[in-house]
Structure formats: structure tokens, C-alpha cells
């Protein structure tokens, strides 16, 4: 009864200072760019960059060097979460979100404008790595700020629904990235694509950045942060406070995100690689056919994100996430061999649709759950840090571990790996308290 009364009192005090539509667009635009960038960079790192930015000789070495630049962003992201989290918790959410979007956007456009190895030699891969590091820094501060923008401007009883707005950017970005590559494959020859066509998606992201900046600049500061600022309760070093006074919830938040990241990268990067690789290594399906399957399956992802937010508001974050994580474990144990391993396009699509729909369900509540674990004075840093450390543990290595397990132990071992990661998330959830009724 105490928690309910607190919630109702808080709701009576709630007065929106930013329109719902502005909050929606401003919070999802950054994650849309993030996932758009993820997929276009991952694709270009395999297909284009080894030929453009690295000396020609050993093609395998060039591909590995190119993929290493992809991994740089995962190292940069926790650094970005600490840097942008520091200013987000001390200066304000609005200014920091503008800065993170600018950092991410400028770095992405720069990649699309970089000259190749044939033009500037060794400076080409160095500048590519630097731009990728800049992307990672911006990304490190993006999601946490977007989640706070949504949840700190939300009516208390709709906090998880509002908190799902940033997660909607993921399927939107992924859908447009896939669509862009399909469109380019229809309109351009291979020679045109390798010459200049690959640059189009990177430069096009500038449009999204401009829209995002326009909306974010017009927002008012979060009312929750303004209370802390007026009371002068900001801490001097948010990361230091986080790692000394809030270690337990930081670790729990990281492991709560683990299954989400592992599931997404297995369903997208690994499944794409396995489905298109020639037999006996993979299924040998046409690349464009798999891209279409992923685009259609991502619709299920997008639909489930707000559904998950509604469920988390109705039944609580912890309870709904425990059920969803259990479903991920069952999917991991029983779906890989019969569906993905069948090689039948209909069953492969069913696998992708099921997995990405579960991704929407597990990702949807995160925008409320992670921020609610932390007090206002370290919330930006805490939510961002947990989210981005989980990206190293669950995202950066997942496709490689999955490929190694499949090669050495078969497809079922990939499912066991996903089930194990989801099991760690389930334990973290069981050790976490319910946060639905608490005030921010």
C-alpha cells in the first residue's frame, strides 16, 4: 500500500513540460542511428573496407583488420558512457544528449567521406579507426541519455511504455539499413557499389542527425534533473560514486542486459553469416533472400517493443522480464536445430521471427528498468555504464563464439551458449528488486 500511495501522490504532481511526440522522436532517433550504423558498418567491414582502407595482399588479413575497427567501438562505448554520463549527471540531460548525437553523427558521416588506402596510404585505416572510436564514444552516451529523456518525462504509470521509445529505434534503424543495402543492390552494379555506393548510407545518416538535433534542442530539461540541480545535489565524480556506492546494482544491471545483447547479435550477425555461407559451413541461402527475411522479422521486433513496455507497466519489470528470459532459454534450447538448422527458408524465417520478437520483448522494458535501478544523481552514468559494459560481454564476442561453437560442436551448442547467457540474466533478475512503484 505504501508503494502504491507514493506512486499516486507522484502522479498527481506530474505535469508534462515536453510533448509526448517530441519525447518519442528525440529518444528514439539516437538508437535508430545507432542500429542503422551498426548494420551498415558491419556489412561494409566485411564487403568493402578490406578493399578500400587496407593494403592489398592477404585478403584474410585485410578482413580481420577491418573487423578489428568494428570492435573498436565496443571498447569506446564504456568510455563514452563514463564521459557523457559525467556531464549528463552534472550539467544536464538535454545538453549531453545533443553532444552525444553530434559526436556519433559527425563520426559516421566522416567515415562516408574518407579517402581510401590508394589515396592517403596508412592514414586511411588510422582515420577509419579514429572515426569508429568517435562513433563508439557517442554511442556510449546515447542510449542512457535517451532512456532518461523518456522515463524522466513519463507519467509514472506509463514509465515503461515511454521507456520503450528508445528501443523502437533499434528495429527502425535495422529495417532502414537492410532496406538501404537492398535498394543499392538493385540500383547499382558491384563496381559502382564498391566505388562510391557504399558511402551513401553513411552520408545519409546526416539527415537523421539533423532531425534529431532539431528536436532535442527544442526540448526542456528533464524535470527530475532540474530538482537535483536546484537542490545542488549533483555529485562531483558520478563514475566514482557509482563504483563505490552502487556496485551491486551496476553489476546486476550489466547482467540483466546480457541476454538482450547476446540474442540480438546471434539473431542478426551470426544468423546472417550462417544462412548465407556455402554448405557444409552454412545453409547457402541467397544473401538478398536472407536480408528480406530479416527485414520482415524485424517488424515482429518493433511490434513487441511497446507490447513489452505495456506488460512491464501492468505486471512489473521484474516479473515480466523473468517470464521473457525463461522464454528465451526455451527458444535457445529447442529452436536452433529444428528451425535454423533445417535449411528450409520458411523454417529459417520462423526462427528469425521468433528470435527477434523475443528480442523486442526483452529489450522493451530496459529503458525503464535500468534507469530505475539508480538514484538521479548517478542515473545517466549508471544506466549507460551497465548497458555498454554488457555490450562488450554479450555483443562484441557473441558472433565469434557462436561461429566457433558451431564449427566445433554443432548448431545445438550455439543454442546452449545463448541459454547460458540468458541464465545469467535470469539470476540477475531474481536478485533485483521490483522498481515499478518507485519515484524517480
From Swiss-Prot:
Keywords: Cell inner membrane, Cell membrane, Membrane, Transmembrane, Transmembrane helix, Transport
Topological domains, Periplasmic: 56-66, 189-192, 270-289, 342-345, 406-410
Stored Pfam families: MFS_1, Sugar_tr
Coiled coil: none
Predominant location: membrane
Cysteines engaged in disulfide bonds, as pairs: none
GO cellular component, one term: plasma membrane
Membrane topology classification: Multi-pass membrane protein
Molecular-function GO terms, alphabetical: transmembrane transporter activity
Positions on the Cytoplasmic side per record topology: 1-34, 88-108, 151-167, 214-248, 311-320, 367-384, 432-440
InterPro entries to which the protein is assigned, alphabetical: MFS, MFS_dom, MFS_sugar_transport-like, MFS_trans_sf, MHS_symport, Sugar_transporter_CS
Transmembrane segments: 35-55, 67-87, 109-129, 130-150, 168-188, 193-213, 249-269, 290-310, 321-341, 346-366, 385-405, 411-431
Superkingdom per UniProt: Bacteria
Subcellular locations according to the entry: Cell inner membrane
Family named by the database record: Belongs to the major facilitator superfamily. Metabolite:H+ Symporter (MHS) family (TC 2.A.1.6) family.
PANTHER family referenced in this protein's UniProt entry, alphabetically: INNER MEMBRANE METABOLITE TRANSPORT PROTEIN YHJE, SHIKIMATE TRANSPORTER
Full protein name: Inner membrane metabolite transport protein YhjE
Lineage of producing organism: Bacteria, Pseudomonadati, Pseudomonadota, Gammaproteobacteria, Enterobacterales
